[in-house]
Amino acid sequence: MKTRALNHSTYQHQYHIVWGTKYRRKFLKEYVKPELLAIFGRVMKKYPELQLVSINTDNDHIHIQIEIPPDISVAAAVQQLKSMSSAHLKKKFKFIKTMYLDGGIWSVGYFSSTIGLNEDQIKKYIAWQGQKDMPQVSTLGF
């Protein structure tokens, strides 16, 4: 994990964040994933202080590992990621737009935890998302 600096602070703030699709609908297919990565890339360009470390999905939820500076709340970062990706995916994929005529595509809430010394285990866990033969959690060192 890299130490970063602002004008008056130095920090290492990495988070593991998970959120699901609204109604747990399984639309995060392999062909949707490149578009999701592209829009998150645009979010990172718009907000260069956010650093996306890793990302992976299962059919109905998304895991990201991200660095967020202390002057930006986790809620604000998640709100940007969710709102921009929701609008883009609805525009790009008609089936998603018809699935969610009433608004956003993501569930209202999210899970977040800080990452410290277990960064490598979190990376492995995220990398294994969506795999059919995911090893037991204990084999990853949790």
What is each residue range found by the language model?
Residues M1-F142:
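Basic nucleic-acid-binding interfaces
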